[in-house]
């Protein structure tokens, strides 16, 4: 048209140039395409398919049981420290603050460890920490004057607080892939609430008298549950239908990063 002709005639230097911001739009489009391509390569099982595998139900049960240690100490640490350990209200309040910090540290530590040492070692290490924490709590009742043992007990038992919530996000992609991660982890929410229901019913009558003997029995039961949860989770993870593909893709990504760093 005449208008288009005049624009070209008056601004010949702009013919063939791209609009302002075009390069940024190209970068965004390339990033989106790369993300979609990566997701398609990662793949994974949808929820309906995952539920048909033994791995799904093993991990469901493992996560449910692994919630017991954290729930037990959150619910009964007050009765424990003010009962058999003999802390007064003010001293206990100070230690409760330390316990909360340890819970947060435990969540951060689990995230770092999963990236550095892998899911299998993380599961083993965190459950060993849980078992060690409750073992220290049992010994502490025979050595109530030991500040060092009290500190170690609070740190270890605090770190096992997020055992189930912080473990699931790393186990699920490895077992079932990342593609349907959101819907699969949502289906595990019920498992991670089992401890809130079962632990009070299980331990309430045992520690009703608040004695060292009753707490010792309760903590021994929790140690047993922690060991069982670790084994079940590892079996479920090793039987994960997508684990081989996940590890192969992760190794490929690691190799690409190394190659990029060398360049």
Region spans (language model):
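Transmembrane alpha-helical cores of Major Facilitator Superfamily
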Residues: 64, 97-101, 128, 186-194
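A late C-terminal transmembrane helix in Major Facilitator Superfamily
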Residues: 175-211
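Multi-pass alpha-helical transporter architecture, strongest
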Residues: 2-8, 223-256
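C-terminal transmembrane helical hairpin of 12-TM major facilitator-type secondary transporters
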Residues: 97-171
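C-terminal membrane-cytosol helix-exit motif in multi-pass small-molecule transporters
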Residues: 1-33, 230-238
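A membrane-interface helix-boundary motif in multi-pass transporters
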Residues: 205-226
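Extracytoplasmic gate region of multi-pass secondary transporters
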Residues: 46-110, 169, 199-203
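Juxtamembrane helix-start elements in MFS-like secondary transporters
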Residues: 87-96, 146, 150, 181, ...
């Amino acid at each position: 048209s005449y208008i288009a002709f005049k624009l070209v005639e008056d601004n010949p230097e702009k013919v063939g140039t791209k609009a302002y911001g075009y390069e940024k739009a190209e970068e965004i489009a390339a990033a989106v395409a790369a993300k979609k391509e990566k997701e398609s390569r990662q793949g994974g099982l949808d929820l309906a398919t995952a539920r048909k595998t033994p791995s799904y139900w093993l991990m469901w049960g493992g996560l449910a049981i692994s919630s017991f240690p954290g729930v037990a100490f959150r619910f009964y640490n007050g009765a424990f420290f003010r009962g058999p350990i003999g802390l007064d209200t003010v001293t206990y309040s100070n230690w409760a603050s330390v316990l909360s910090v340890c819970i947060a540290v435990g969540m951060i530590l689990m995230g770092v460890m999963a990236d550095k040492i892998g899911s299998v070692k993380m599961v083993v290490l965190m459950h060993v920490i849980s078992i060690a924490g409750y073992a220290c709590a049992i010994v502490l009742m025979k050595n109530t004057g030991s500040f060092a043992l009290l500190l170690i007990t609070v740190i270890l038992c605090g770190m096992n607080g997020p055992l189930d919530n912080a473990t699931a996000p790393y186990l699920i992609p490895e077992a079932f892939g990342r593609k349907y991660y959101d819907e699969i982890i949502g289906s595990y929410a019920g498992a991670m609430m089992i401890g809130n229901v079962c632990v009070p019913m299980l331990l309430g009558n045992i520690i009703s008298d608040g004695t060292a003997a009753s707490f010792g029995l309760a903590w021994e039961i929790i140690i047993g549950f922690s060991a069982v949860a670790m084994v079940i989770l590892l079996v479920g993870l090793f039987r994960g239908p997508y684990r081989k593909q996940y590890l192969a893709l992760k190794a490929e990504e690691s190799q690409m990063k190394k190659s990029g760093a060398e360049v």
